[in-house]
């Protein structure tokens, strides 16, 4: 079936069920609509590499306004929402466009197995956050996120993350956007540990001075950047004594290039 799917409201994958999305599928979400993955439910996106500019094998999630004026308008629909206990989600060759939040991840399933495993995923033009993970457990390879109103990737309330060969850009155009936010803060409870979080051969670069924003409360904030490009233009040395940004600390930053101005080390 070559026809696209149009979703009104939030479609929900029931518990213990798996939604399998075949290569080339197009899903259009109406305003205030999205996809919910229930506890013990699974999302399997089987997109594949394409041979033409038509992206014939790519899976695409976007809004239902197809006029050219809406091609890059953020916030046209809601989110792909992974509820607590959702697990074993495998996502390949998926593009998400013009959502409010591309992926919302609410807690992992409490096991060492990643809640979400992604490869060749692209997320563009989200009104708030590309991936908002709250105590998530995620892995990603060849992930690209760009142009988000708050952050491209937000790893909040701790969790565990592993990203390789990824680009977290943000050229939203105003002053308060980040490519990456990481925090172990939990507003309502004690801080939640962020453990075993790794970024390997990744880019964090955008139109604002700071590509990353890190926040540590009591508890653990365990992260490492390996061979990454990070934009961090601290013109007034406001973070000079903050240990989270000690780029010479090889327990946190190994082989990284730090873009300390806007004219050198541009990707």
What is the predicted function of each stretch?
Residues 1-267:
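Beta-strand/loop edge motif enriched in small/polar residues
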């Amino acid at each position: 079936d070559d026809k696209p799917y149009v979703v009104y409201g939030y479609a929900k994958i029931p518990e213990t069920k798996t939604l399998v999305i075949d290569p080339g599928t197009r899903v259009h979400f109406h305003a205030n609509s999205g996809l919910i993955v229930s506890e013990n439910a699974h999302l399997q996106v089987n997109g594949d590499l394409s041979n033409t500019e038509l992206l014939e094998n790519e899976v695409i999630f976007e809004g239902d306004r197809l006029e050219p004026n809406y091609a890059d308008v953020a916030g046209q629909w809601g989110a792909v929402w992974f509820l607590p206990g959702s697990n074993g989600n495998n996502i390949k060759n998926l593009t998400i466009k013009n959502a409010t939040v591309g992926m919302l991840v609410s807690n992992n399933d409490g096991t060492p197995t990643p809640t979400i495993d992604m490869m060749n995923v692209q997320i563009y033009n989200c009104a708030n956050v590309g991936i908002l993970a709250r105590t998530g457990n995620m892995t990603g390879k060849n992930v690209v996120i760009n142009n988000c109103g708050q952050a491209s990737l937000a790893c909040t309330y701790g969790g565990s993350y592993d990203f390789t060969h990824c680009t977290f850009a943000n050229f939203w155009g105003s002053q308060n956007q980040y490519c990456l936010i990481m925090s172990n803060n939990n507003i309502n409870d004690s801080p939640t540990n962020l453990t075993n979080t790794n970024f390997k051969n990744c880019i964090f670069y955008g139109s604002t001075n700071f590509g990353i924003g890190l926040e540590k409360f009591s508890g653990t904030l365990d992260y490492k950047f390996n061979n990454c490009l990070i934009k961090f233009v601290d013109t007034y040395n406001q973070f000079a004594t903050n240990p989270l940004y000690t780029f010479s600390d090889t327990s946190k930053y190994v082989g990284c290039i730090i873009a300390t101005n806007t004219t050198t080390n541009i990707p």
